From Swiss-Prot:
Belongs to the GHMP kinase family. IspE subfamily. Catalyzes the phosphorylation of the position 2 hydroxy group of 4-diphosphocytidyl-2C-methyl-D-erythritol. Keywords: ATP-binding, Isoprene biosynthesis, Kinase, Nucleotide-binding, Transferase. InterPro entries: GHMP_kinase_C_dom (IPR013750), GHMP_kinase_C_sf (IPR036554), GHMP_kinase_N_dom (IPR006204), IspE (IPR004424), Ribosomal_Su5_D2-typ_SF (IPR020568), Ribsml_uS5_D2-typ_fold_subgr (IPR014721). HAMAP family: IspE (MF_00061). The lineage of its organism: Bacteria, Bacillati, Bacillota, Clostridia, Moorellales. This is 4-diphosphocytidyl-2-C-methyl-D-erythritol kinase. ATP binds at P93, L94, A95, A96, G97, L98, A99, G100, G101, S102, A103. PANTHER family: 4-DIPHOSPHOCYTIDYL-2-C-METHYL-D-ERYTHRITOL KINASE, CHLOROPLASTIC. The gene is ispE. Pathway: Isoprenoid biosynthesis; isopentenyl diphosphate biosynthesis via DXP pathway; isopentenyl diphosphate from 1-deoxy-D-xylulose 5-phosphate: step 3/6. It comes from Moorella thermoacetica (strain ATCC 39073 / JCM 9320).
Amino acid sequence: MDVLTLPAYGKINLTLKVLGRRSDGYHNLSTIFQSIALADRLTFSRCREGIRLETSGLPVPQGPENLAYRAAARLQSRYGFPGVRITLKKQIPLAAGLAGGSADAAATLIGVNALFNLGLTPGQLAREGAALGSDVPFCVIGGTALGRGRGEELSLLPPLPTLWLVLVKPSFGVSTAAVYRGWDASPGQTPMEAPDEERALAAIRRGDRAGIMASLGNDLEAVTCRLYPEVMAIKMRLLAEGAERAVMCGSGPAVFGVAADGETARRIASRLQETYPETIVTRTL
């Protein structure tokens, strides 16, 4: 194999509960991850030496600051291969809570493993990914999964009924560290709709769309909305335009609204795109 092209799918959190701060500075979470169709695209090819990363689309670093580069460097140092050229077409909004960087790292682990026949299993790749970021193991596995610990301890779940989504990313990014510091300062702040993980798990297992919808929620939403009130404004706007539910993605600032169908999602998006150019229609996988 000389060239390989892979998608790097983003994610949302259907539910996200913060269980407390750990001694290592991270936080224990319980979250239901869900892959979405919105994706970056990465092409991998062999080169004589080193790691060469070329990017297009949204602006991202091309060196060691990029998680895709760091994923390739990790496998190169641990398992050895001469060199790889990576071409990244970046489409997932940056610093949005959609795991765009983690998705690129996961695709790189998968792509380099296949290109150079390293023979690593998905479980081994997920463990390598855990050293790069908390969301990388899920992005390696994909689909629907319950995450514990930092999010890296995964239990696979049955696939969801398709949910049509309107993603809205404001013009600013959010510091994940700042959001968690805010949570530490005022733990237990109640979001507009608290996540109901047990109900969500039961609904997912029986394919109950209404039950899934009623269970959505994110413990970090109240913190991020206090720090960045526009996130709450986006949430309310999505609901006003016809979204059935609206929940913040990860630590924010992007918000996803769930629409009844694709046509409704496109209509909602058309009403928000003038104010929020980074408004995207996608669906769960």
